[in-house]
Amino acid sequence: MKITLVGSRYFGATAFDAICKEGIAVARVVVPAADDRLAQVAQAGGVKVVVLDDPNNVPASAIAEGSEIIVAAHSHARVSTEALARARFGGIGYHPSLLPRHRGIAAVEWTVREGDPIAGGTVYHLAERMDAGAIAAQDWCFVRKGESARDLWERALAPMGFRLLVEVLRDVKATGILPAKPQDEAFATRAPMIPAPANAPAR
């Protein structure tokens, strides 16, 4: 099975390694910047890297010919409808919440802010609306008392994401089927960016 990986930074680079170890061919990597960590890892592995002209949009031309699936791993770029049409199964991404809860860029922060006792992660189909595509796989974990968003991400949700992405790809490779369970809109919530406090020190 051949995929195109769209992503960035630590999560994208680690997902790349996990997918390659599974024996799945990464035909192309798409990144927002040439010096991105994912770009460096892909180039070291001999994989072609495409740097987006517009870091907010993935055009069809960025997707490798013959890709069966597009995988988004920490990508803030929207994968266009035309790009999704280039892959047999379209695209999937990982979101660190139990979708449809906490749709948005700050899902882990809102999980902690709202005092959720349970968190989770979802592999979902990329779609026109952000984080609203059908669910391919989910798992959950408890949130520890006093745990920060960063701690929760590093302890549980990032490792969960790598595992779920690999499990979904492994199953698609074996069965030719990508599960698609529609999200229940009755339970949808938003997780927009949380502004830093006005008196927060500069970094």
Language-model regions, residue ranges each:
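Structural motif
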Residues: 6-9, 32-33, 53, 73-74, ...
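Hydrophobic beta-strand scaffold residues
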Residues: 26, 48-51, 90-91, 119
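Conserved nucleotide-sugar phosphate-binding/catalytic loop shared by glycosyltransferases and other
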Residues: 31-56
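Short, charged, surface-exposed secondary-structure boundary motifs
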Residues: 37-40, 60-61, 101-108
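Short amphipathic alpha-helix with an adjacent loop that forms part of the alpha/beta core around
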Residues: 56-66
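Acyl-group handling in specialized metabolite and lipid biosynthesis
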Residues: 194-203
